[in-house]
Amino acid sequence: MKTLTRKISRTVITLLLVIIAIVLIFRIWVFYTESPWTRDAKFTADVVAIAPDVSGLISEVRVRDNQLVQKDQVLFTIDPPRYQKALDEAQADVAYYQAVMGEKRREAARRNQLGVSAMSREAIEQANNDYQTTEHQLAKAVASRDLAQLDLERTVVKAPSAGWVTNLNVYTGEFITRGSTSVALVKQNSFYVLAYLEETKLEGIRPGYRVEITPLGSNQVLRGSVDSIAAGVTNSSSTVDSKGMATIDSNLEWVRLAQRVPVRIHLDSQPGNQYPSGTTATVVVTGAQDRKDNDMPPLMKLIHRLREFG
């Protein structure tokens, strides 16, 4: 009798364990498939590559690497005395041609007033032509002066927006050329997440759907919403040869790797530079509504945590 009872107990326990295992496997399967998710997501921000519009020696650097700067804050200056001299020269040219043009205008007016009775028509036309030529020369000098003024203003390189200076590689006394990138500015309040989700999961994603973002190595869960889905990605399986013929890569019919599509995610609140642009995160699309952590069983919370690594 005891042997029979023991066998029945073992059988019942085994069945219970099997049922529990089936339930756990089912719950895990549902959890992994009900919500589109990926561990291939990156924090991203708008980055401005700052390059000077003039060439010259760097006179002063007023910021340090990774410093938070405000809009129009001076980053560095480039040889202002040289460009001030160029502006002074251009202003002198303008003054000279203004004086010459005044003289030519009076001469042309005098000859036009005297008329052909006092001098030849050629002399009158020559005076008018000289006046027009000087007028054009003055306009050119004014344009050169305005350009010199603009160059002088551009010797002071300012931040186009608030943000963090990064990869600062300019130093006082260094010669810098026009158009060469000198520093990158990560714009403040421009952070978002780019999640690369498999094409098989796109059916469960719509703009406006709520998203949970877990930075790699962090217990903090950020929230956001789907902003947009990329309209296309590069077809890596097809290229064109030198003769314009299509070249298609060989593929195994029973092995299909899902293409990853970028999905842009808007963050509800900006994290500042706590999670720098380029760092990794796990993203879960929860649907039209946020998922409440208080209603989630402990087991599901554990699975949610393990999903970051698994």
Curated annotation (Swiss-Prot):
- The reply to whether Cell membrane figures as a keyword in the UniProt entry is yes
Q: Tell me which PANTHER family the record gives.
A: P-HYDROXYBENZOIC ACID EFFLUX PUMP SUBUNIT AAEA (PTHR30367:SF12), P-HYDROXYBENZOIC ACID EFFLUX PUMP SUBUNIT AAEA-RELATED (PTHR30367)
Chief localization: membrane
**Pfam families, per the entry:** CusB_dom_1, HlyD_D23
Q: Which organism is it from?
A: Erwinia tasmaniensis (strain DSM 17950 / CFBP 7177 / CIP 109463 / NCPPB 4357 / Et1/99)
Q: Where in the cell is it found?
A: Cell inner membrane
Describe its membrane topology.
Answer: Single-pass membrane protein
Family that this chain belongs to:
Belongs to the membrane fusion protein (MFP) (TC 8.A.1) family.
| Transmembrane intervals | 12-32
Q: Which HAMAP family is this protein grouped with?
A: AaeA
Record function comment = Forms an efflux pump with AaeB.
Q: What is this protein called?
A: p-hydroxybenzoic acid efflux pump subunit AaeA
The record's keywords, sorted A to Z, are: Cell inner membrane, Cell membrane, Membrane, Transmembrane, Transmembrane helix, Transport
Q: What is the lineage of its organism?
A: Bacteria, Pseudomonadati, Pseudomonadota, Gammaproteobacteria, Enterobacterales
Single GO cellular component annotation? plasma membrane
- SUPFAM superfamilies for the chain: HlyD-like secretion proteins
User: What is an example of a GO molecular function annotated in this UniProt entry?
Assistant: transmembrane transporter activity
